[in-house]
Amino acid sequence: MEHNTDTVYNFSAGPAALPKAVMLQAQAEFVNWNHLGTSVMEISHRSQPFIQVAEHAERDLRDLLNIPDNYKVLFCQGGARAQFAAVPLNLLGDAETATYIDAGYWAMSAVKEAKKYCTVDVFDAKIEKEGKIAVLPASEWRIANNAAYVHFCPNETIDGIEINDLPVTDKPIVADMSSTILSREIDVSKYGVIYAGAQKNIGPAGICIAIVRDDLLDLASDLLPGVLNYKILAEQESMFNTPPTFAWYLSGLVFQWLKAQGGVKAIEEVNRAKAALLYGYIDSSDFYRNEIHPDNRSLMNVPFQLAKPELDDTFLELAEARGLVSLKGHRVVGGMRASIYNAMPLEGVQALVDFMKEFEAQYA
């Protein structure tokens, strides 16, 4: 659809908006990168120039997340869904059971894959609180005594649910942070494994980050393919096979951009301001509603419904004409969804709220 504005704000849940400065830099370097006369896509992943890209990206990510030295940072392929299989195959060791916390769609997607490799002890953490959807405090999660690890998804993009606490357990905690990594400060040392598909807050689709504590590298199943084996990837510095070099390069540019914004602490303040603005307007309105309790509302993904669902298509059409794109909710829940990852400026959320006010005034 043709837009009636030169400014477009992309609320896609993923692949998501990249920082404009990153895209402009990549555009400027695309044909002649680093004065080599070729694109970064065209050089060997084992060449010194690309090894410098890889090392710089890892160093910046370690700085941004304060990753301790006893963790490996792996740049993997296959996205988070590959990690749904990689996690049990890497971490079970001699165990046969793992606990998975169910708080939404992606947590259960991980469960379905893990069931191929182990007995999955599922704990349903979803509850109703004050008429809204919420999640039990992590202190109340039931974790099996014989579990090799406990897995959860801190941010559910479809449901718009965020979990902000961790259980106290001696089991390794594994977190699918695909949609929340780098959006807020975390203590990496409290986790055994963190993994995240790139296409939300890291870079373009095609690469996945895994942060793995060293003591968990020797538990892999003999059946585990080499491309998913954390120890092999660590030993080969994520170059066991040819990696997605352009996605790796772009992710490195995003890390540089984020450091220039002041790092994760600074971007978290912006993210909280964006979320407060949007949720605040939704809560003040009788025309829009959000079904998630404030204790567990996602900073990154804001689903909302109109009081008149028959107006959904009209809302989307008029929003797109205003340069507010990719607001259609996931098919599982319907309605609308505004994904407001790190690259979404506060001005974009303000533009959305202004449009929502105008739409309500006209159609309520």
UniProtKB/Swiss-Prot annotation:
Residues the entry annotates as binding L-glutamate: R46
EC number: 2.6.1.52
GO annotations of cellular component type: cytoplasm
Source taxon at top rank: Bacteria
Transmembrane segments annotated in the record for this chain: none
Positions where N6-(pyridoxal phosphate)lysine occurs in the chain: K200
Keywords per UniProt: Amino-acid biosynthesis, Aminotransferase, Cytoplasm, Pyridoxal phosphate, Pyridoxine biosynthesis, Serine biosynthesis, Transferase
Residue ranges of coiled coil: none
Keyword presence, Cytoplasm: yes
Signal peptide residue numbers: none
GO molecular function, one term: O-phospho-L-serine:2-oxoglutarate aminotransferase activity
Residues the entry annotates as binding pyridoxal 5'-phosphate: A80, R81, W106, T157, D176, Q199, N241, T242
InterPro entries in the cross-refs: Aminotrans_V_dom, Pser_aminoTfrase, PyrdxlP-dep_Trfase, PyrdxlP-dep_Trfase_major, PyrdxlP-dep_Trfase_small
Cofactor: pyridoxal 5'-phosphate
Gene3D superfamilies noted in UniProt: Aspartate Aminotransferase, domain 1, Type I PLP-dependent aspartate aminotransferase-like (Major domain)
GO biological-process terms attached to the record: L-serine biosynthetic process; pyridoxine biosynthetic process
Reactions that this protein is recorded to catalyse: O-phospho-L-serine + 2-oxoglutarate = 3-phosphooxypyruvate + L-glutamate; 4-(phosphooxy)-L-threonine + 2-oxoglutarate = (R)-3-hydroxy-2-oxo-4-phosphooxybutanoate + L-glutamate
HAMAP family assigned: SerC_aminotrans_5 (MF_00160)
Summary of subunit composition and partner proteins: Homodimer.
Protein family membership: Belongs to the class-V pyridoxal-phosphate-dependent aminotransferase family. SerC subfamily.
Name of the molecule in the record: Phosphoserine aminotransferase
Record organism: Vibrio cholerae serotype O1 (strain ATCC 39315 / El Tor Inaba N16961)
Gene coding for it: serC
